[in-house]
Design a protein with these regions (language model features):
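Nucleic-acid nuclease catalytic cores
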Residues: 93-143
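A short, surface-exposed helix-loop junction/capping segment
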Residues: 24-34
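Conserved beta3 VAIK motif of the Hanks protein kinase fold
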Residues: 90
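Active-site metal-binding core of divalent-cation-utilizing nuclease and nuclease-like domains
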Residues: 37-87, 95, 125-138, 148-152
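Intrinsic disorder/low-complexity segments
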Residues: 1-16, 139-160
Length: 160
């Protein structure tokens, strides 16, 4: 299957997560509004866990994720900051800027666990920074998504 067809097929998969991703980012915005920026990651993690719970959103903090190779479950696990629902990985940062290694960490989690959606949230700036990604299993790649969960081509503004 070509990369274009594979990505198009996955767009429908990504779109079904639009509402829950919107709710998670909204909860993070609420936490950021109350706590402001510059605190340590564990503070934001705990506050976000409480906010998600208050919103009735199922989430697990520091959940061990199993890794897969082909159809085999590996013994190696990773701990994601959050798993929302059963398959959305949320990584929290509190940095002046998101760096390529922060994205790489999320992408590794998504690829090795075959999680369809990943959200990277940065509380370290005066305005909350969030990025949405989708995992394309056929090509084993993670793609940037816009707020409507459509694949988008990143530009310099998206990664500042």
């Amino acid at each position: 299957m070509s990369k274009v067809k594979s990505k198009t097929k996955n767009m429908k998969t990504f779109e079904k997560y639009e509402d829950i991703v919107f709710q998670v980012i909204g909860a993070a915005m609420h936490v950021h509004h109350i706590l402001n920026y510059g605190l340590s990651e564990p503070i934001y993690q705990e506050a976000l866990q409480l906010e998600l719970s208050d919103e009735g959103i199922k989430s697990e903090r520091e959940k061990a994720l199993h890794c897969f190779y082909k159809n085999y479950k590996l013994e190696k696990t990773y701990k994601a900051d959050f798993v929302v629902g059963d398959d959305i990985i949320v990584e929290i940062k509190s940095r002046a800027n998101l760096l390529p290694e922060h994205r790489a960490q999320l992408f590794n989690y998504m690829r090795l666990t075959q999680s369809p959606i990943g959200i990277l949230i940065n509380f370290g700036r005066s305005h909350l920074q969030s990025e949405r990604y989708g995992y394309v299993k056929d090509t084993n790649e993670c793609v940037l998504l816009d707020r409507y969960m459509h694949i988008k081509v990143p530009n310099s503004q998206d990664i500042l």
